[in-house]
Regions:
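Structural signal for membrane-spanning alpha-helices in multi-pass inner-membrane proteins
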Residues: 122-126
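Hydrophobic alpha-helical connector segments
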Residues: 17, 21, 31-57, 109-116, ...
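Amphipathic, non-transmembrane alpha-helical scaffold segments
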Residues: 15, 19, 23, 76-87, ...
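Short beta-strand "wing" residues that participate in macromolecule-binding interfaces
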Residues: 105
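Short secondary-structure transition hinges
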Residues: 52-91, 102
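Helix-turn-helix
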Residues: 1-13, 17
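C-terminal peripheral helix-coil segments that are non-catalytic and often amphipathic
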Residues: 44-45, 49-53, 88, 92-100, ...
C-alpha cells in the first residue's frame, strides 16, 4: 500500500475523501477572493487553484480511480453529489455573474453551472487518460477560458 492509504481503511474510503479535499481547497480560495472580483474570473481562479492542488498533491492513478469509480458505480457518486460545497459555489457564482452582467443570461444559471463542471471534468479526464503527462495547472490556464469563455459577456471598454 502507498503512503496515501496509511490514513484510510481502504481505497473506497480514500476515493470518497477526494471530493472533500477538493471542496476544502475551493472554500479556502473562495474566502480569499475579493468579493468585487469579476464572477467569471472567480470561477477561473477557483478552477486553476484546485487543478494546481491536484497536479502537486494527488497521484494521477488515484484521480483516475476516482473518475472510473464514478462511471461504473451504482452506489455513491461522491464527485457528482449536488450537496457538495463545489456545486453550491459554482451555482452561486454563475448566478452572481448573471446578475452583474458578466455571464450570459441566455440560459438558466444552473445550466451554465453544469457546463462549467463539465469543462472542469473534461480537463481532469484528459489529464487522467494522458497519465498525467503534462502540467495540469498550466494546461487548465490555457484550456478552461477557451472551453467556458462563451458564457462570458464582453465588457465595454471604458
Amino acid at each position: 500500500k502507498g503512503s496515501f492509504y496509511h490514513y484510510y481503511s481502504g481505497k473506497d474510503e480514500l476515493l470518497a475523501s477526494l471530493p472533500e479535499i477538493f471542496d476544502a481547497k475551493y472554500e479556502e480560495v473562495m474566502q480569499a477572493l475579493d468579493p468585487e472580483m469579476d464572477s467569471f474570473d472567480k470561477l477561473m481562479t477557483l478552477c486553476f487553484s484546485v487543478h494546481d492542488l491536484i497536479e502537486s498533491d494527488i497521484p494521477v492513478g488515484l484521480l483516475a480511480s476516482l473518475y472510473s469509480s464514478q462511471v461504473v458505480t451504482k452506489g455513491d457518486k461522491h464527485l457528482l453529489n449536488q450537496n457538495r460545497f463545489y456545486y453550491k459555489m459554482v451555482n452561486q457564482l454563475v448566478d452572481e455573474g448573471q446578475r452583474r452582467g458578466q455571464i450570459t443570461r441566455s440560459m438558466p444559471y444552473y445550466e451554465i453551472a453544469h457546463m462549467y463542471a463539465l469543462c472542469e471534468r473534461a480537463i481532469i479526464y484528459d489529464y487522467c487518460i494522458s497519465d498525467g503527462g503534462y502540467a495540469l495547472g498550466e494546461y487548465t490556464r490555457k484550456t478552461m477560458p477557451l472551453l467556458f469563455g462563451g458564457v462570458r459577456v464582453k465588457q465595454e471598454v471604458k
